[in-house]
């Protein structure tokens, strides 16, 4: 397939058409027509447009591959791919064949709404007459948005450009002889009927750091408004109040018991009623004092246990010495010896 990259005239919204033949057989020949349409006299300037590859299933011959790429991010560019027979190329027939429409716009900011207009038979034939697109009623049908870059089989991958121009593809079976598509930027949500698909390459899906727009809310949010209270709500409210009252009474009773246990607080409470905060503060001080006293008592108890063990060892030593002394006296008596201390006492 021959590649054709025409230069578009920025001063006018003229049509840039390119026709190429691929595997022309004895029965039919397929051509490609490329058109650029602006929104009006004030449409932004468009730059070069190239053809490479689009989904193969959209066209009759699966060996043909197309690619649409915009080198400028601004404005709106509409491409119309028309299958042309031999008779249409020679100007013998006015009826157009299967038509596939691909439109693109820079999805830079706001929400995009897809509208559908009708075209006559002249708009589908290659030539200058295809530049004018009269509007007409048409029924909505499913569409698919293909994010650039995309590839089809062995076609070269498109280069990623800032702005990420996207393509809305309408198959030939859904587009009739008198229909076309234009993309306009509006403030409303997408009004196209049917299902909405977003297809892109894995590199674009796994790419990190890119900001993605969230789908707008299709229905307005209605805040919950409380109506009149039912008897069931009143009964639950009364039960809740009763539970809270019992809980407060229990807390007050425990605080009164604390005031009676604490010595200083009990004396003060007899004179003037102490507050709950004062009672709890004195209770905390009393608990800290009890902990310190308990720690001192534990240390004293350990010391007493150590002294008791020492006394037990001394008592055992005294018993051993007494037994040894008794044995020595028995030996002296056997040898008829008198102890010096005993003779002196006598």
From Swiss-Prot:
Positions of region (Disordered): 1-44, 215-244
SMART domains attached to this UniProt entry: HLH
Recorded superkingdom: Eukaryota
GO molecular function, one term: bHLH transcription factor binding
Physiological role: Transcription factor that binds to a symmetrical DNA sequence (E-boxes) (5'-CACGTG-3') that is found in a variety of viral and cellular promoters.
SUPFAM superfamilies, A to Z: HLH, helix-loop-helix DNA-binding domain
Annotated keywords: DNA-binding, Nucleus, Transcription, Transcription regulation
Quaternary assembly: Interacts with MAF. Efficient DNA binding requires dimerization with another bHLH protein. Binds DNA as a homodimer or a heterodimer (USF1/USF2).
Cellular location(s): Nucleus
Feature: compositional bias, Low complexity: 11-20
Disulfide bonds: none
Pfam families given in the database record: HLH
Domain called bHLH: residue spans: 235-290
Entry GO terms, CC: nucleus
Region (Leucine-zipper): 307-328
This protein's name: Upstream stimulatory factor 2
Classification via InterPro entries: bHLH_dom (IPR011598), HLH_DNA-bd_sf (IPR036638), USF (IPR051732)
Compositionally biased region (Basic and acidic residues): 226-244
């Amino acid at each position: 397939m021959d590649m054709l990259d025409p230069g578009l005239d920025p001063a006018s919204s003229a049509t840039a058409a390119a026709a190429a033949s691929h595997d022309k057989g004895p029965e039919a020949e397929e051509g490609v027509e490329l058109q650029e349409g602006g929104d009006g006299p004030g449409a932004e300037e468009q730059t070069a447009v190239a053809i490479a590859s689009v989904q193969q299933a959209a066209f009759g011959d699966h060996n043909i591959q197309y690619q649409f790429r915009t080198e400028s991010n601004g404005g709106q560019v509409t491409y119309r791919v028309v299958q042309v027979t031999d008779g249409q190329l020679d100007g013998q027939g006015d009826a157009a064949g299967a038509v596939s429409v691909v439109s693109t716009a820079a999805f830079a900011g706001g929400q995009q709404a897809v509208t559908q207009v009708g075209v006559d038979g002249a708009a589908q034939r290659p030539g200058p007459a295809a530049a004018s697109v009269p509007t007409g009623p048409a029924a909505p049908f499913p569409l698919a948005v293909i994010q650039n870059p995309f590839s089809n089989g062995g076609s070269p991958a498109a280069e990623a450009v800032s702005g990420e121009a996207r393509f809305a593809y309408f198959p030939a079976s859904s587009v009739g002889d008198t229909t076309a598509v234009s993309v306009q930027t509006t403030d409303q949500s997408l009004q196209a009927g049917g299902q909405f698909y977003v297809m892109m390459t894995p590199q674009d899906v796994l790419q990190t750091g890119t900001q993605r727009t969230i789908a707008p809310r299709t229905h307005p949010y209605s805040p919950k408004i409380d109506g009149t209270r039912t008897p069931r709500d009143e009964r639950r409210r009364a039960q809740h109040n009763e539970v809270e009252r019992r809980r407060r009474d229990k807390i007050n009773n425990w605080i009164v018991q604390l005031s009676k246990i604490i010595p200083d607080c009990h004396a003060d409470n007899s004179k003037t009623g102490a507050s709950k905060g004062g009672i709890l503060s004195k209770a905390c001080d009393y608990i800290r004092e009890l902990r310190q006293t308990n720690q001192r008592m534990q240390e004293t108890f350990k010391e007493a246990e150590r002294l008791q063990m020492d006394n037990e060892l001394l008592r055992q030593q005294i018993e051993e010495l007494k037994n040894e002394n008794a044995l020595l006296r028995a030996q002296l008596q056997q040898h008829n010896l008198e102890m010096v201390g005993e003779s002196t006492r006598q």
